[in-house]
Regions:
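C-terminal substrate-binding subdomain of Rossmann-fold SDR/epimerase-dehydratase oxidoreductases
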Residues: 20, 207-333
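Generic recognition of well-ordered alpha-helical segments
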Residues: 107-110, 155, 159, 203, ...
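Short, solvent-exposed loop/helix junctions and linker helices
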Residues: 7, 99-102, 195-199, 233-236, ...
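Alpha-helix initiation/capping motif
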Residues: 68, 130, 142-150, 194-198, ...
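N-terminal Rossmann-like NAD(P)+-binding domain of SDR-like oxidoreductases, especially those catalyzing
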Residues: 1-184
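A conserved pocket-lining segment of Rossmann-fold NAD(P)-dependent short-chain dehydrogenase/reductase
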Residues: 90, 142-143, 180-234, 261
Length: 333
């Protein structure tokens, strides 16, 4: 039986990845969750335990020592999600973001080296690309000067990993640059569960559909087909599956250090997303147009051909699946 350590495993993408890890049967895999629940909801653990077996939880900050855990378990691979992730919050609390996101990664890399853990998947972000002139973006697209402390922690994290791999050739690392994960598990049992007021687009839309509260669309005069920002939305279950694919890829490719985009390859505007949500779910969204928000990227979408080539990964779910699953989850809350 393989044992996988998932840091931040109670979070949005982490919890869906755990379901993917245990999808083929819990007799083949044991999952250890390392999470301090600072930005995740403990209720997710209850839901996971109802859906799968072989999940153990350690309520621990990733910056603290985990030697006792690693001594008691032979870890075959690590998926490192644990990080602070709100762009706006990072601007207001930059030192907290640098401390948490960088030091937790350093601690995990040090543990991998000392305990001979040879596979690591790192949660990175498309925010590293910023505004680009040529679309779609691939892994060779020049990275921008990060627009937020959050994005900068991901850029520094990737550089730290590159240096680490250069000096530890027996350890493989794949950094996955997510585009815009949305949606929820098809069961409706888990999904995005913000512990404060939602900031991400689909939870905000769901909240508006549920309560009638007016949501804000920031800008409708951008140089796009309808004036609103365009993003590459990808179903969270597709994102989750890529982490399992990455572990499988590293099991037969020792000493690699790769960066891989995860996106659908299709750009969808904010207004198109709202319209699709309304049509698929039979609801009306109360929204208003506000001024454009400083720092927002106008449009971005991914070339994910490298993911298909190396991991055999491609998206299974479309935008209709994303909005329907998100609404199903929201109604179950």
């Amino acid at each position: 039986m393989k044992t996988i350590l998932v840091t931040g495993g109670a979070g949005y993408i982490g919890s869906h990845t755990i379901l993917e890890l245990l999808k083929e049967g819990s007799e083949e895999c044991e999952v250890l969750i390392l999470d301090d629940f600072s930005n995740s909801n403990p209720l997710i653990i209850n839901k996971l335990n109802k859906m799968v077996n072989n999940v153990k939880v350690y309520a621990r900050d990733c910056r603290d020592t985990i030697d006792d855990i690693l001594t008691n378990h032979k870890i075959d691979g690590v998926i490192h999600f644990a990080a602070s992730k709100a762009v706006g919050e990072s601007v207001n609390n930059p030192l907290e973001y640098y401390d948490n996101n960088i030091n937790s990664l350093l601690n995990i890399l040090d543990a991998c080296k000392r305990f001979d853990i040879r596979s690591l998947v790192f949660s990175s972000s498309c925010s590293l690309y910023g505004d680009v002139d040529k679309l779609p973006v691939n892994e060779d697209t020049e990275l921008s000067d990060p627009q937020s402390p959050y994005a900068y922690t991901k850029l520094v994290g990737e550089r730290i990993i590159s240096d680490f791999c250069n000096s530890n050739s027996n350890i493989s690392v794949v950094s996955l640059r997510y585009f815009n994960p949305v949606g929820a598990h098809e069961s409706g049992e888990i999904g995005e569960y913000p512990i404060t007021k939602p900031n991400n687009i689909l939870p905000v839309i769901c909240n508006s559909a549920d309560t009638g509260e007016e949501m804000v669309v920031f800008g409708d005069t951008y140089d796009t087909r309808d004036g609103s920002c365009i993003r590459d939305y990808v179903h969270v279950s597709d994102i989750a599956r890529a982490h399992v694919d990455s572990l499988n890829y590293m099991s037969s490719n020792v000493g690699i250090c790769d960066v891989i985009n995860l996106g659908s390859g299709d750009g969808v505007s904010v207004l198109e997303l709202i319209k699709t949500f309304e049509e698929v779910n039979g609801v009306n969204i109360n929204y208003k147009i506000s001024d454009a928000r400083e720092g927002d990227i106008v449009q971005i979408y991914s070339d994910s051909s490298k993911a298909k080539k190396l991991l055999g990964w491609e998206t299974k779910y479309d935008i209709k699946d994303m909005v329907s699953s998100a609404w199903k989850w929201h109604k179950n809350l």
